[in-house]
Amino acid sequence: MYKNIYIVADVEGVAGLVFYEYWDKEMSLLNHELLRRNRVLLTEEVNAAARGAFAAGAEKVVVHDHHGAGYTIIPELMDERLELIHGRGEQHLFLGTSHPDLDQGFDALLLIGMHAKAGTAEGCTPHSYIQVETAAGQTYALSEATMSMAIAGDCGIPCAFIAGDRATVEDALSLCPGMHSLATKKNYASQLTRTISPILSRKLIESGVEAALRQDRLQPFKITGPCKVRIGDRNPQVLWPEKPETCASFSEALIATLRNVPWYKPVSEIDDGWRFPDRRQVTPPTQWNIPPTGEKQP
């Protein structure tokens, strides 16, 4: 039986979301409302997953807020039995992992609010592209969802359930066909979707998670190393590395590559705590290793 459950939560794949709040720091009431409602939508889907897990006999459920600056889930609206990992993503690198404590005795991974990888024609706000090449000649194109599945696989942990847009759910099921899933919306384009009701989504997540955690144990999705990782991004400061570092495991290779992404370069392991963590305040451009030709990654 699955006793200790780890949830990774993103926001773009929740039912009812079709685009973010505005990114120009506009301080309008509309922008405030967009951000507030998206946070509520995610928090309630996480609560639904927690209810399903506890109904299936879980003893501990921890959720990692993995969207943006890691401050999207609203703590005061959380199920009281949940524990929350939140905060600045770049400081994970000092721990050597993208998901803190995942290797500390957890039995199953749940994915909530997942979105499709960059380049997906029918994905809601698709972004992030992680390319993996193994020494054995295998290649993978991962989304953030399947990336989390692979990190869990390095810890021997299976992914039991995923909720998100249809494109990312189908992508994840192609790698782990036995897990339970919920497609919260069908996407026509990056900001045009047909969504189910958030109320229905929460009901289906709760029942789906309970069913998933009552089934026989699945095999983890594991990428066999050694391997190397490249990260694609339309931001020209994120280079497509010519010779990424080869590491023994996927998780190690991912961390090695993330250390070269501009906004994943924290100034200090121990920050002074008096600066609001605006992720746009990154290393000055003069310190970025941009090729003289100005070439961008594919």
Task: Label each residue range with its predicted role.
Residues 3-27, 38-42:
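N-terminal glycine-rich anion-binding loops that anchor highly charged ligand groups
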Residues 8-9, 64-65, 109-114, 162-163, ...:
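Short beta-strand segments
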Residues 16-21, 33, 40, 44-104:
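Glycine-rich nucleotide/cofactor/substrate-binding loop typically near the N-terminus or early
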Residues 19-37, 127-137:
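A solvent-exposed, charged loop/short amphipathic helix patch at secondary-structure junctions
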Residues 92-94, 129-155, 163-167:
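Active-site glycine-rich loop that binds ribose-phosphate moieties when present
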Residues 151-212:
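Active-site rim beta-loop-alpha module in soluble metabolic enzymes
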